[in-house]
């Protein structure tokens, strides 16, 4: 199912937000469509308050908490540079940070309530695709932009989002293609897949399966498991029974338990090739395991190499940062929101949403907020090329092109998060 026109969708969202506002609002803080046609005046009636307020719903707790520090750092660095350059619409951008938790809690929904109560115009998050899906309707029906730096589920390409959802991370169709190609090119003709059962895990497993089998390999067993399970012995036993040459692990922090069970059942990484994904590639989750447990294990993470100069700038806002995963995507999300508000001359979500596509492609290229906003003020169209790469949003709010990094663990059960073994670039629709 293809989305309806984003312009119509945003107009619909604007009318819904206006209706909500008419029932009474709160004081601003700091810190399937198919609706009837909406008159243009409805959208025009929803205006911002003159101060762009960005909220974050990013993981401070939960199974993706290790992604929180680089994502918060990316947002903070972008806002520092934006405000140092004069802010948006002549005022400093306000920020409100909240926790996304994970799917085992209701933290994200409570955080969104807080942000909407404080009149956030755009919300950056969540990191988890399932968490984002759970809060998307609440955010977009309020006429607020939701912008994730890390969601990769293919489901968001066609989801009913009122034209207000965007992401700088690519859909899993690209990561799945790269991972499937990697598994086969490493000489594996039989593959087992252990994937967490949610939109992220199942969707990525589908794409890996398709790609690997098109390349001539056979997926001999696939197990979609409950990530909340206490143990995974039966799941691993199903994989072991089919004796694959490679095992693809798609999950979050529960992967540590899966790894322990693989070792227990004799499917160690020196006997069977393991492959991971962005959700479980971690430099903290496996440190307590015996040395070399993960030695040689490869995994994929969306995103190009974070330039060394960018990493140094990140350290100015968080000197303790050691992981840069999705920092660039968070930085670009924040910068794009600010540029879109400048282009719209309005900070409201329904006004800036259509401009997000416009500022991402088709105009004069620029690579930072200051140079881009100077071009906008001179009356020129811009094409923001970010730290994460050229964004070039398509009509679904997805980046049109993206890069996937291939990483490898060493004997200390860690990988070099600053530099991949290789980077593979591709078109999302390709």
Give the positions of each predicted feature:
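Extracytosolic ligand-binding ectodomains
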Residues: 1-18, 22-430
């Amino acid at each position: 199912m293809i989305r309806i026109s984003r312009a119509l969708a945003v107009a619909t969202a604007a009318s819904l937000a206006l209706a909500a506002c008419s029932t009474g609002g709160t004081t601003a803080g700091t810190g399937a469509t198919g609706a009837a046609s909406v008159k243009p005046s409805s959208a025009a009636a929803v205006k911002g308050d003159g101060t762009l307020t960005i909220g974050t719903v990013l993981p401070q707790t939960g199974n993706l908490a290790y992604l929180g520090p680089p994502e918060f750092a990316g947002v903070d660095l972008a806002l520092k540079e934006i405000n140092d350059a004069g802010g948006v619409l002549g005022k400093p951008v306000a920020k409100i940070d909240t926790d996304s938790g994970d799917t085992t809690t209701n933290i994200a929904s409570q955080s969104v309530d807080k942000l909407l109560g404080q009149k956030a115009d755009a919300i950056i998050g969540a990191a988890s695709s399932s968490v984002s899906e759970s809060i998307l309707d609440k955010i977009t029906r309020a006429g607020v932009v939701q912008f994730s730096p890390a969601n990769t589920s293919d489901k968001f390409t066609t989801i009913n989002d009122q034209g207000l959802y965007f992401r700088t991370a690519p859909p899993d169709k690209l990561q799945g293609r790269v991972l499937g190609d990697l598994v086969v090119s490493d000489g594996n003709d039989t593959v087992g897949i252990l994937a967490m059962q949610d939109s992220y895990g199942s969707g990525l497993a589908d794409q890996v399966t398709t790609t690997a089998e098109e390349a001539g390999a056979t997926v001999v067993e696939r197990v979609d498991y409950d990530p909340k399970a206490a143990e995974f012995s039966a799941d691993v036993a199903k994989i072991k029974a089919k004796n694959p040459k490679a095992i693809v692990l798609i999950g979050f922090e529960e992967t540590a338990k899966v790894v322990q069970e693989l070792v227990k059942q004799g499917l160690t990484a020196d006997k069977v090739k393991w492959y991971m994904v962005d959700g479980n590639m971690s430099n903290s989750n496996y440190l307590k395991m015996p040395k070399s447990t993960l030695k040689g294990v490869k995994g994929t993470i969306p995103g190009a190499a974070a330039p060394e100069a960018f990493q140094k700038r990140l350290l100015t806002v968080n000197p303790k940062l050691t992981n840069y995963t999705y920092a660039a995507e968070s930085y670009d999300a924040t910068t794009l929101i600010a540029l879109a508000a400048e282009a719209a001359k309005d900070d409201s979500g329904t006004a800036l949403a259509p401009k997000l596509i416009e500022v991402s492609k088709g105009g004069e290229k620029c690579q930072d907020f200051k140079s881009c906003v100077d071009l906008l003020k001179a009356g020129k169209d811009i094409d923001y090329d970010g730290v994460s790469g050229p964004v070039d949003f398509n009509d679904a709010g997805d980046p049109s092109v993206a890069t996937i990094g291939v990483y490898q663990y060493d004997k200390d059960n860690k990988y070099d998060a600053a530099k991949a073994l290789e980077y593979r670039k591709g078109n999302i629709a390709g």
